[in-house]
């Protein structure tokens, strides 16, 4: 799951 949040990429609830 890739979600763009706060200009950051959140993958599986982890910040990449």
UniProtKB/Swiss-Prot annotation:
Stated induction or repression of this protein's expression: Identified when cells are grown in rich medium (at protein level).
Recorded superkingdom: Bacteria
Name of the protein in its database record: Protein YoeJ
Organism of provenance: Escherichia coli (strain K12)
Gene name linked to the record: yoeJ
């Amino acid at each position: 799951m890739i979600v763009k949040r706060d200009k950051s990429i959140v993958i599986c609830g982890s910040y990449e």
